[in-house]
Amino acid sequence: MAASVEQREDTIQVQGQALFFREARPGSGQAHFSVLLLHGIRFSSETWQNLGTLHQLAQAGYRAVAIDLPGLGRSKEAAAPAPIGELAPGSFLAAVVDALELGPPVVISPSLSGMYSLPFLTAPGSQLLGYVPVAPICTDKINAANYASVKTPALIVYGDQDPMGQTSFEHLKQLPNHRVLIMKGAGHPCYLDKPEEWHTGLLDFLQGLQ
């Protein structure tokens, strides 16, 4: 019998801005840990809802929370802490994690969201259980010493038809503790092109963190 899943939608206040989020969690028992899902510029938390990622994570025993980033989706009214393509302060995502009471989470970070996740990942004493970058932007804005200092396990994901995925990998491969999932025939939002492969690879990585 499939495990039951509880889902909800709400907003949180982060640094004076209202951010929308969707959450799925196991219907019974404790969640293993939290997974925070970010998104690219043409997407929102709805992407993870429609793809079934939130549901699959909750069924596997994780608390999955997808936010709409400032200025996008249903957080359109919120002011972003940095212009698009510039690194946001790591304190922004730290404040999101605090507001949602996630504990040390795994962060899934495609494309645009790299501007938020990379400063959080490389901040001294970063409370991050795992990192799943999917062809994120801003990888060239982090220096080698900062990459080398990251102890967080990472699963680097990209489609082999995505030049940006290859470019970001050239930087991300400096993370000392990483695995790579290259999706053949997939483009920039590779998780949309190959959802089954995405979910299998993601759940496998998360299981290794338990």
From Swiss-Prot:
ATP-binding found in the keyword field: no
Keyword flag Acyltransferase: yes
InterPro entries xrefs: AB_hydrolase_1, AB_hydrolase_fold
UniProt-annotated catalytic positions: S111 (charge relay system), D162 (charge relay system), H188 (charge relay system)
Protein name: Putative protein-lysine deacylase ABHD14B
UniProt-listed Enzyme Commission number(s): 2.3.1.-
Family in the record: Belongs to the AB hydrolase superfamily. ABHD14 family.
Catalytic activity: L-lysyl-[protein] + acetyl-CoA = N(6)-acetyl-L-lysyl-[protein] + CoA + H(+)
Organism of provenance: Pongo abelii
Coiled coil: none
Gene3D superfamilies documented for this protein: alpha/beta hydrolase
One Pfam family it belongs to: Abhydrolase_6
Subunit structure: May interact with TAF1.
GO molecular function, one term: protein-lysine-acetyltransferase activity
Cellular-component GO terms for this entry: cytoplasm; nucleus
